[in-house]
């Protein structure tokens, strides 16, 4: 018989590159893409975003990049990531795979969700782009009738990928 290469050890979801490209986001934060799944609750704003899975504390999540842990080991950041900003550029993501409390012994050290950011890889075609995003106080609503403090946040970067040896060896680089 035919055997599938896809395995699952519990409930989960996959956010594809197309989903990422079509989702409106002010700061290109991971929370903006994860909230497409109703099992997540996103609290806070911009740098203090807290991602809760299935009602658990945000620190119970495990965040990985291509399977390598990228958590906050000291518990200093409210978001649970190793950095205050996004730990990886959204432009480098091929997909975001989420597993909610899987029963596999190969996935552990968390009780909420395993959020795995899968990066893009190079192909036989040389492709790349430069990008930039900025935001300031003009993007903030005037809900309480209070003046908003001035601020500015700019993000600039590039991604490029292609072949080193056609059909055998590829590269992909991103900088932000």
What is each PLM-predicted segment?
Residues 168-169:
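Repeated loop/turn-to-beta-strand initiation elements of outer-membrane beta-barrel proteins
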Residues 1-121, 139-143, 153-162:
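Periplasmic N-terminal accessory/gating domains of Gram-negative outer-membrane beta-barrel systems
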Residues 123-125:
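Short helix-loop capping/hinge motifs at secondary-structure junctions, enriched
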Residues 56, 175-176:
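Short, well-ordered beta-to-alpha junction loops that form the rim of enzyme active sites
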Residues 146-150:
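Conserved ANL (AMP-binding/adenylate-forming) active-site segment centered on the GW(Y/F)…HTG consensus within
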Residues 130-136, 173-175:
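Transmembrane beta-barrel strands of outer-membrane/channel proteins
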């Amino acid at each position: 018989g035919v055997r599938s290469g896809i395995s699952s050890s519990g409930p989960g979801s996959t956010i594809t590159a197309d989903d990422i490209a079509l989702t409106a986001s002010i700061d290109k934060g991971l929370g903006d893409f994860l909230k497409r799944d109703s099992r997540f609750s996103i609290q806070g704003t911009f740098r203090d975003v807290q991602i809760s899975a299935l009602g658990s504390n945000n620190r119970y999540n495990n965040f990985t990049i291509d399977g390598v842990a990228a958590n906050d080991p000291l518990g200093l950041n409210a978001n649970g990531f190793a950095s205050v900003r996004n730990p990886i550029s959204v432009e480098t993501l091929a997909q975001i795979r989420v597993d909610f409390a899987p029963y596999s012994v190969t996935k552990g050290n968390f009780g909420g969700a395993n959020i795995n950011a899968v990066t893009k890889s190079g192909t036989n075609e040389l492709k790349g782009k430069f990008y930039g995003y900025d935001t300031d106080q003009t993007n903030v609503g005037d809900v309480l009738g209070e003046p908003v403090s001035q601020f500015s946040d700019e993000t600039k970067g590039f991604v490029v990928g292609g072949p080193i040896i056609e059909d055998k060896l590829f590269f992909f680089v991103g900088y932000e």
